[in-house]
Amino acid sequence: MNVAIIGATGYSGAELFRLLHGHPHVSRCDVFSSSQDGVHVSESFPHVGSVDGAVLHKLEIEALSRYDAVFFATPPGVSGEWAPALVDRGVKVIDLSGDFRLKDGAVYEQWYGREAAPAEYLQKAVYGLTEWNREAVREAVLLSNPGCYPTATLLGLAPLVKEGLIQEDSIIVDAKSGVSGAGRKAGLGTHFSEVNENVKIYKVNVHQHIPEIEQTLQTWNEAMEPITFSTHLIPMTRGIMATIYAKAKQPISPNDLVDLYKTSYEGSPFIRVRKVGQFPATKEVYGSNYCDIGLAYDERTGRVTVVSVIDNLMKGAAGQAVQNFNLMMGWDEAEGLQSLPIYP
């Protein structure tokens, strides 16, 4: 199997390269760039200097059309321009950007501030929240990989929403991410002196992942209302913790909550539901494709609390992309992803 990565000089692209380089079914993994040609990836990431042939190539449709699958780990706007031509040529595309996540182009343009991809391809794209969309992923030609925050949030909410157990207008999500979630481009906001020993909120009420989360919730339950969603930058490299609050329609015991989630995620190799009274930490999924979930119910307030943690570069990006790629190719979804978290 021959694959290509566009955008291998960013954090998600580098993680993709690491995973695909060691994938049991991938014999060749080439890298492409819109800004560099003939430069070895090690110029950006010295840790891959021992990999022969990891030289960046210029973006060309004809060259990319020769691959079985092409991954886009690019900023918004790139895949929207290039992916349709590849799809038309029968190449399977896995897009890690947000260009194909939203079905309504006007909504994309409102939240991303740029022109949307052609409507035909927005409708054709399959949303790759793997655990809840396996059958569609298996048939996908254009796969839209979920964002990091939506992955943690939606995996945490799905059983409650699908079973109709929470009030539709009551969801509050308090999400925190490591600095790698802001990307590799240098900026004041991610400067060491600004991030170290500091926690800060950002994109209050305007984060582009809000409509993505709401769109999916409404496909599960048309009565779902807008959510309250806040994001914070934490002084760590990797990891997302989404702490989710929602008002239960009826009292539910912690044991029943845990049983619901374990049943919902039975057969999902990367979802680990904690015992009653136990809650996950980001360190416990570091470097892995796992999503760990802890649950509680407060009898005083009638609220359910869900704690969902992932590695933002793995389950929140490259790991989930490979999980979807596996299904698209007819393999076991866990191929190349079985590594346990790195600890400590």
Swiss-Prot record:
Coiled coil: none
Predominant place of localization: cytoplasm
PROSITE patterns recorded: ARGC
Annotated EC: 1.2.1.38
Locations listed in the record: Cytoplasm
UniProt-annotated catalytic positions: C148
GO molecular function, one term: NAD binding
SMART domains given in the database record: Semialdhyde_dh
A Gene Ontology biological process term: L-arginine biosynthetic process
GO cellular-component term (any): cytoplasm
UniProt-listed InterPro entries: AGPR_AS, AGPR_type-1, NAD(P)-bd_dom_sf, NAGSA_dehydrogenase, Semialdehyde_DH_NAD-bd
Pathway recorded for this protein: Amino-acid biosynthesis; L-arginine biosynthesis; N(2)-acetyl-L-ornithine from L-glutamate: step 3/4
Function of the protein: Catalyzes the NADPH-dependent reduction of N-acetyl-5-glutamyl phosphate to yield N-acetyl-L-glutamate 5-semialdehyde.
NCBIfam families for the chain: argC
Stated name of the protein: N-acetyl-gamma-glutamyl-phosphate reductase
Species annotation: Geobacillus kaustophilus (strain HTA426)
Gene coding for it: argC
